[in-house]
């Protein structure tokens, strides 16, 4: 039940952002704690949670993502998810991430911003005021993952 409520809360939040963008009005502020949880859901559930039949291969680099207003931070390893679905037989080979344990990897790049800006950015709802530094290849890999969209 908790997973469903969490998912619905973030879906409703992004639908609100979409409605404001469509109406051409400024996007209202997002609750920082809800936005930070939204970041966590994208990174840990939507991108990093792999099916049992899939494997992960590291690629472009390690990125630290920091919400400057809440103090939350995540370190991710970019990579490829590959495998064949045991349900459909479809073969996958697509960008993915793996969450790193805090302090386990030195980041190649950093991304910083408010939780609200980062959450919207990960959902491909604009650049907001995101600070990026470090490896261009790692940042480009993350940008490609964001451009592919959250599913």
Residue ranges and their predicted role:
Residues 1-7, 14, 20-151:
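Structured surface interface patches that mediate subunit assembly and partner/cofactor docking
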């Amino acid at each position: 039940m908790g997973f469903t409520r969490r998912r619905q809360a973030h879906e409703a939040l992004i639908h609100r952002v979409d409605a404001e963008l469509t109406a051409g009005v400024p996007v209202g502020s997002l609750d920082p704690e809800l936005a930070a949880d939204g970041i966590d859901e994208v990174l840990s559930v939507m991108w990093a949670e792999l099916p049992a039949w899939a494997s992960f291969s590291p690629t472009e680099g390690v990125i630290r993502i920091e919400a400057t207003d809440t103090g939350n931070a995540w370190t991710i390893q970019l990579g490829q998810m590959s495998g064949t679905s045991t349900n459909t037989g479809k073969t996958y080979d697509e960008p993915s991430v793996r969450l790193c344990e805090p302090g386990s990897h030195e980041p190649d790049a950093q991304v910083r911003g408010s939780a609200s800006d980062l959450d919207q950015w990960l959902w491909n709802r604009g650049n907001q005021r995101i600070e990026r530094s470090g490896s261009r290849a790692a940042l480009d890999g993350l940008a490609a993952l964001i451009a592919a969209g959250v599913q």
